[in-house]
């Protein structure tokens, strides 16, 4: 069922909280892979199916009619994020005039339904649990941090300084090669303004940033 309101979406998300991947997959008649080595997107697909996500294209939000993006957040036993969170691919060409206000990153992060999930590898995939959903919109300070990082990184892209981009740049968001291997090639702008072959780059939220979102939710949650 495709949720028609935010309340319906949250209700559906709350109804699967506490289930294991195996329980939910059996309910939806979806086979469970032995692990995620060859099926990295399986958990996201499982939750999209369970919640009725509509986006056929990754350029849109998962629940575009509600203005909501769905993000899974693998956490360890202490409740800390295990990995960075992919947001969107960076526009390496045809990016002149692009501003934070109309960027894909801002669009994707304007309203997020976070689904924390058990991510520790010693737990068999079928036995990992789904956590309580978190509806999140960036605070003014978080938006400032995201905008600052985005502008700094986009400046390097637009000026043809791709070779100067490292994962260390950015307070809460970083740029990293996106792709299962280094054979994925796309077009970018070189230092002299020429079109060059380069690796696709993706914007990723740092673990410290998503940990802050988790902690804020836990602090406001009634006991």
Curated annotation (Swiss-Prot):
It holds the Pfam family MutH. CDD domains: MutH-like. It comes from the Bacteria. One of its GO terms (cellular component) is cytoplasm. GO terms for biological process: DNA modification; mismatch repair. Keywords: Cytoplasm, DNA damage, DNA repair, Endonuclease, Hydrolase, Nuclease. It is found in: Cytoplasm. GO terms for molecular function: DNA binding; endonuclease activity. Sequence-specific endonuclease that cleaves unmethylated GATC sequences. It is involved in DNA mismatch repair. Belongs to the MutH family. This is DNA mismatch repair protein MutH. The lineage of its organism: Bacteria, Pseudomonadati, Pseudomonadota, Gammaproteobacteria, Pasteurellales. The gene is mutH.
């Amino acid at each position: 069922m495709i949720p028609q309101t935010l309340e319906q979406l949250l209700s559906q998300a709350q109804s699967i909280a506490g289930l294991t991947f195996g329980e939910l997959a059996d309910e939806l008649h979806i086979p469970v892979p032995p692990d995620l080595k060859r099926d990295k997107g399986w958990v996201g697909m499982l939750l999209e199916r369970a919640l009725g996500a509509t986006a056929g294209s990754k350029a849109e939000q998962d629940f575009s009619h509600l203005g909501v993006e769905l993000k899974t957040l693998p956490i360890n036993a202490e409740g800390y994020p295990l990995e960075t969170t992919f947001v969107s691919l960076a526009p390496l060409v045809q990016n002149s005039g692009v501003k934070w206000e109309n960027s894909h990153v801002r669009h994707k992060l304007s309203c997020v339904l976070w689904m924390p999930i058990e991510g520790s590898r010693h737990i068999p995939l079928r036995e990992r649990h789904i956590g309580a959903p978190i509806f999140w919109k960036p605070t003014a300070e978080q938006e400032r941090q995201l905008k600052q990082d985005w502008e700094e990184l986009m400046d390097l892209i637009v000026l043809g300084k791709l070779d100067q981009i490292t994962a260390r740049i950015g307070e809460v968001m970083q740029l990293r090669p996106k792709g299962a291997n280094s054979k994925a090639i796309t077009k970018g702008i070189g230092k002299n303004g020429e079109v060059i072959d380069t690796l696709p780059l993706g914007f990723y939220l740092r673990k410290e940033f998503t940990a802050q979102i988790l902690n804020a939710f836990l602090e406001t949650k009634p006991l």
